[in-house]
Amino acid sequence: MQIADQSKRVVYLGTGRRKSAVARVRLIPGSGQLWINGRNGADYLQNNPIYLNLVKAPLETLGLENSYDIYVNATGGGLTGQADAIRLGIARALCQLDIENRKPLKTEGYLTRDPRAKERRKYGLRKARKAPQYSKR
């Protein structure tokens, strides 16, 4: 979705989900800063290059690394789930920016929501699929 904020700048919105993590992303024309939950993105992701590269991958695919400031509100899950959710949210926001961005992002797999989530525990079992030890006698 595309909206205008108080200073009349255009804001592009995208929502990403992964496992139990949800990330609401705002892209604002700027210098390429990343803010997650009010903190610097590198600090929030513990300066882990894997997470940082994961989050910035959609922008690098389109060559827009230093064109937009990214503001993220991420809740739930752990760092891996949140990083994947942020990547999906950024990719969806970039599709709002220009419909031509959709094809390269889809080719790289950045617009695909990973459906894997924790399976619920069933009664009579110790975990989702682990059964108590069987004793024949």
Swiss-Prot record:
GO terms for molecular function: RNA binding; structural constituent of ribosome. One of its GO terms (biological process) is translation. Residues 106-117 have a biased composition (Basic and acidic residues). Keywords: Ribonucleoprotein, Ribosomal protein. One of its GO terms (cellular component) is cytosolic small ribosomal subunit. Residues 106-137 are annotated as: Disordered. Disulfide bonds: none annotated. Residues 118-137 have a biased composition (Basic residues). PROSITE patterns: RIBOSOMAL_S9. NCBIfam families: PRK00132.1. Belongs to the universal ribosomal protein uS9 family. This is Small ribosomal subunit protein uS9. It comes from Thermosynechococcus vestitus (strain NIES-2133 / IAM M-273 / BP-1). The gene is rpsI.
